[in-house]
Amino acid sequence: MLEFAHEKFNRLDCICNNAAASRGIGPLESYSLEDVQATLDLTFTALWKCLQAEIKYLKNHPNPASIVNISSNSALKGYAFNSIYAASKAAVNNLTQSAAKELARKNIRVNAVSPGTINTPGVKKYFEDEPSAKEALEKSSLLRRIGEADEVGELVAFLLSERSSYITGQIISVDGGSSIN
């Protein structure tokens, strides 16, 4: 995909990395090594591999560039019964800040967006299966609602744009205040 974009447009200025999956939800002691490895592979390692490939295209790029990684607010304060996913997203946050430090001198900004509960098809399905969860998650937000995907997308678009040219190494929450509640 990177080769196609680079060949078609002869440049690559902005990239959003969004990789996530959780292999099971349950108590920490219930996870198998395979569950842990699969979650890390799909959530952290996949993003890391993308970042490595992107850097090859961007490091000698004459124009400023921006990378946004999608994290999760579970990385900021842990997540009971989904701890491996939370840990994998915490690794994404650390990778984001490490990459920002390494790549700033090449005029490449790297940030992460950390969504809370967002009204996606997967979340809707979860609420169908667990109706009480929706109310509990709405109450955990200072704004008393679930976020919408376009609210995350607007922040990503801003961070990828030149309007955010002085922002790098940041983990920015889009969670209705639930991370501070």
Where are these regions (language model features)?
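Catalytic Tyr-X3-Lys loop
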Residues: 13, 29-49, 68, 85, ...
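Short C-terminal tail/terminal secondary-structure segment
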Residues: 22-25, 77, 157, 168-181
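Conserved mid-core segment of classical short-chain dehydrogenase/reductases
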Residues: 22-37, 56, 60, 81-84, ...
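Active-site helix of classical SDR
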Residues: 51, 88, 96
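Residue(s) in the substrate-gating loop at a strand-loop-helix junction
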Residues: 72
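C-terminal helical subdomain
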Residues: 112, 135-163, 167, 176
